[in-house]
Amino acid sequence: MEIKLIILSLALLLDRFVGDPPQLWQKVPHPVVLFGKAISWGEKRWNNRNLSASVLRRNGMWLTIGLVMACVVLGLVLELSLPFAGTAGAVAEILIVTVLLAQKSLADHVQAVALALREEGIEGGRRAVSMIVGRNPEHLDEGGVSRAAIESLAENASDGIVAPAFWFLVGGLPGLFAYKLINTADSMIGHLNDRYRDFGRFAAKLDDVANYIPARLTGLLASLATAITKDRLSGKEAFSVMRRDARLHRSPNAGWPESAFAGGLGLALAGPRQYGAEKVEGPMLNASGKRDANADDIDAALHLFWSTMSLMTGLVIAASLIGLLVG
């Protein structure tokens, strides 16, 4: 376990300060892009709406299981073979874990929304936020754009960093690859619309299971980070709002980090939203909080995000050092 902790510590630091070099992914496809292509291939082949709901559910289930198993096998092959490469193998594993984390890329995309709002106004903000959310930004005002960016930041703190780190510690590269495939499948086919309701049902449920613990860990880390960086009362408020409102969210997991951020920042988040032609109703998290968010609130959310990531990284580094000393 201490080896995994050391690898994860270095990967978290590398991802934070270097991130994903765009020049690299212009030349070779990102692993998540390859996952997406495999899912898209299977969806086009087996999601035939002339089939019955039960057959579509079965097709989606077997596609997801098959791709997850392929990821597990690939992860096992790499995990068993890389040690034979010595230092180069260790460096390769650190780099693999790094590219499957998303601290810097997530923060950069969210920061771009605040920058666009300040420099280009509402139209620029809408364009920037459309890069990170699935909802229709066309009718969002400044508050709606800002809340959407903050909600995406909170949810993806779990999905993009805490969950991959968790599953790497639990299952090594096989666990990390499997999680990223599951999460990618959910983002592509796990929607409650006519096209994906049946075919993507299994992927959506599996993603709920995979994110159950990481989402709650993220909310707890955000609450602790609020207490450390602001004050104890603010941290208690973040934790209290999370415990009270997390289950109000339509997602069984996203509500935990989002409500912790809402409480820690004093904002009202979530509520009704538009996905294309589909309007999804929902209650506000921390309904008594500020609703007319702006670019300054995005900056505050980014500060909380980085504080949360620093806390997690510090805990991982501390655990790795303890493991080395005890070992």
Swiss-Prot record:
Pfam families: CobD_Cbib (PF03186). Signal peptide: none annotated. GO terms for cellular component: plasma membrane. GO terms for molecular function: ABC-type vitamin B12 transporter activity; threonine-phosphate decarboxylase activity. One of its GO terms (biological process) is cobalamin biosynthetic process. The chain crosses the membrane at residues 60-80, 82-102, 159-179, 304-324. Coiled coil: none annotated. It is found in: Cell membrane. It is a multi-pass membrane protein. Its main location: membrane. Pathway: Cofactor biosynthesis; adenosylcobalamin biosynthesis. Disulfide bonds: none annotated. Keywords: Cell membrane, Cobalamin biosynthesis, Membrane, Transmembrane, Transmembrane helix. The keyword Membrane applies. Belongs to the CobD/CbiB family. Converts cobyric acid to cobinamide by the addition of aminopropanol on the F carboxylic group. PANTHER family: COBALAMIN BIOSYNTHESIS PROTEIN CBIB. This is Cobalamin biosynthesis protein CobD. It comes from Brucella anthropi (strain ATCC 49188 / DSM 6882 / CCUG 24695 / JCM 21032 / LMG 3331 / NBRC 15819 / NCTC 12168 / Alc 37). The lineage of its organism: Bacteria, Pseudomonadati, Pseudomonadota, Alphaproteobacteria, Hyphomicrobiales.
